[in-house]
């Protein structure tokens, strides 16, 4: 599959997602390429590399930042690279971090703080250093956190950075 530039509709969807998460300036520093196959994978490459990709026709180039369709879905690499604001984030303590990286869900007692989001929202799970550990789905709104018992699941693990070691789930889970 060859790389191509995103079409107008795809670019609009990608720009909207980048802007929502505070990375609107990403496109001024990097170029986007779409690799169409079973899914439309979006890759970010440097402007210098972008100039020679057409001549090389590589199988892979740059960093996969997500997939585009009716909406843009960040990849784990994309979240680490692109998220610049605190929107839809949950910060966990060390124990919560360890359990999440082992594939477990986040319990209310492991959450140190959370930005504002609703129930069933896609959230980005972070450690105390602001590293994105993975992507989850909230079972409750952030407003309900203080009223939940510590042993209640607050965020369901969809995919995490420990995934490549376990090989149990696929990245298609979200």
Curated annotation (Swiss-Prot):
Molecular function via GO? RNA binding
Out of the domains of life, which is the source? Archaea
UniProt-listed CDD domains: PUA_Nip7-like (cd21151)
Concerning InterPro entries, the annotation shows:
NIP7_N, PUA, PUA-like_sf, PUA_sf, UPF0113_PUA
Q: Where is the PUA domain?
A: 87-161
Q: Which Gene3D superfamilies match?
A: PUA domain
Please report which protein family the annotation says this sequence is part of: Belongs to the UPF0113 family.
Protein name, per record: UPF0113 protein AF_0058
Which species?
A: Archaeoglobus fulgidus (strain ATCC 49558 / DSM 4304 / JCM 9628 / NBRC 100126 / VC-16)
Q: What is the lineage of its organism?
A: Archaea, Methanobacteriati, Methanobacteriota, Archaeoglobi, Archaeoglobales
């Amino acid at each position: 599959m060859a790389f191509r530039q995103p079409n107008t509709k795809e670019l609009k969807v990608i720009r909207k997602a980048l802007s929502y998460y505070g990375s609107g300036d990403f496109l001024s520093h990097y170029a986007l390429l779409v690799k169409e196959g079973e899914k439309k994978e979006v890759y970010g490459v440097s402007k210098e590399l972008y100039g020679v990709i057409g001549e090389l026709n590589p199988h892979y180039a740059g960093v996969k930042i997500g997939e585009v369709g009716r909406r843009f879905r960040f990849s784990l690499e994309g979240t680490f690279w692109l998220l610049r604001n605190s929107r839809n984030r949950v910060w966990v303590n060390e124990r919560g971090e360890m359990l999440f990286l082992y594939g477990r869900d986040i319990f209310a007692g492991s959450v140190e703080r959370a930005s504002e989001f609703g129930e069933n929202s896609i959230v980005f799970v972070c450690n105390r250093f602001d590293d994105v550990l993975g992507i989850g789905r909230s079972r409750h709104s952030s407003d309900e956190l203080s009223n939940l018992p510590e042993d209640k699941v607050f965020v369901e693990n969809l995919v995490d950075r420990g995934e490549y070691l376990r090989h149990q789930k696929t990245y298609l889970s979200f």
